[in-house]
Amino acid sequence: MSQVNMRDMLKAGVHFGHQTRYWNPKMGKFIFGARNKIHIINLEKTLPMFNEALTFVERLAAGKNKILFVGTKRSAGKIVREEAARCGMPYVDHRWLGGMLTNYKTIRQSIKRLRDLETQAQDGTFDKLTKKEALMRSRDLEKLERSLGGIKDMGGLPDALFVIDVDHERIAITEANKLGIPVIGVVDTNSSPEGVDYVIPGNDDAIRAVQLYLNSMAEAVIRGKQGAATSADEFVEEAPAESAEG
């Protein structure tokens, strides 16, 4: 089972919230106190909630479900991309396009366009075009890759969202809520936990904290997938023995 511990969270600075004047009262029950006008998050509360979220993700991955990793702000984007790719999950690291979930039909058409352009770039079609046309298509390809590259292999709506900074990704959460897609989210002291099914109270800015969340989630996914593969192997091995007994 995927687990994080208190020491890891303290080292990563998960407990440092935002300045006290920016607090959201809805996060009050997760705040331990304040130090130098900075709210301190109660990690005794965070620990079980974080681990519950990891268990949920591991279970989803074991069932071959897709978890969409979402983190488009500068401090999160690169890590989101790396960790999602490492565990084979879709991601949005650049900008959330309105309708990415609620208007998936249109998004699917854009993904098809992206795939077509990728093929053209590889099969020599670009070389046969005028310089201007080739440049325009290259720019199109770059733009689409930046916006949709992380979800081009998603193959349909995700089964859950994992979000870094729920304020920054509020549109994504609203869309998931409309469609009944569960949301796992890191919620800092200045944010609202509304619309988040699995709340992880914690610092959503510090690079080390963001790294910890994403690394732990990726590990949970990998463990879930490995567990599913192992049990599938065991099932195959045991099946003939059972039928032989019958």
UniProtKB/Swiss-Prot annotation:
One of its GO terms (biological process) is translation. It comes from the Bacteria. GO terms for cellular component: cytosolic small ribosomal subunit. The lineage of its organism: Bacteria, Pseudomonadati, Pseudomonadota, Gammaproteobacteria, Pseudomonadales. CDD domains: RPS2. It holds the Pfam family Ribosomal_S2. Transmembrane segments: none annotated. This is Small ribosomal subunit protein uS2. InterPro entries: Ribosomal_uS2, Ribosomal_uS2_bac/mit/plastid, Ribosomal_uS2_CS, Ribosomal_uS2_flav_dom_sf. SUPFAM superfamilies: Ribosomal protein S2. NCBIfam families: rpsB_bact. GO terms for molecular function: structural constituent of ribosome. It comes from Pseudomonas paraeruginosa (strain DSM 24068 / PA7) (Pseudomonas aeruginosa (strain PA7)). Belongs to the universal ribosomal protein uS2 family. HAMAP family: Ribosomal_uS2_B. The keyword Ribosomal protein applies. Keywords: Ribonucleoprotein, Ribosomal protein. The keyword Disulfide bond does not apply.
